């Protein structure tokens, strides 16, 4: 009897979980972006039982794989083990090219999924034409009732999901309703896709007015560059259960807090 490739794949998944003794389900690997990309040297797989601050027991997502143990003592000490490395979690590993038993970086990709936001505050629409003193005076003259109505902080950010899916957080769907407001919020680019490559986080974003078009293109697996999409490469400087710090190629740091797992 001919055995289908789907059946073989299913058996491999079952064996992976048996090796790791994990009850968690296997995550779906990210989809490839439509644009040409540099080679990804990161290995992807599961954290296995026996992992600690000095060693990562790892089961790679590939045929005939066996659990491997990587030395992560130096990486952990230098802050390049990102996340808690929980048994059964989906992780990415960068291997030392000069020592195949050492991981130079590991990132818990299950833990990075979720909703991450930062707080933004409104500013006067004509703030660029006013001095700081004039702004303070104008705010002081504003009745408390109007302050409560307009000076409301918002949470901007993104939700990272399975299969490279992402959605922006903090978008004002009814944009027209804010046109008569004396204040405005900082412009934000909307995250529509994410992935990890070579130990870095890649976020694909579009302008607010292109969001609907871009999301339709994502659903159809089309190249979102036609919607003005760009992909930013970010270093993950720190990640805890509730905090995420990213750094841009220009050296700017961005801090987020988790609002939903």
Locate the predicted segments by residue.
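Contiguous, well-ordered beta-strand patches that form the walls/edges
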Residues: 38-77, 122-126, 145-242, 247-252
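Short nucleic-acid-contacting surface segments enriched for D/E, G, S/T with interspersed K/R
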Residues: 77-92
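Short, charged beta-turn/beta-strand-edge "cap" motif at the junction between a beta-strand
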Residues: 50-51, 94-101
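N-terminal helix-cap/turn-to-beta initiation motif at the start of protein domains
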Residues: 82-85, 102-117
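Bacterial N-terminal signal peptides that target proteins for export
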Residues: 1-8
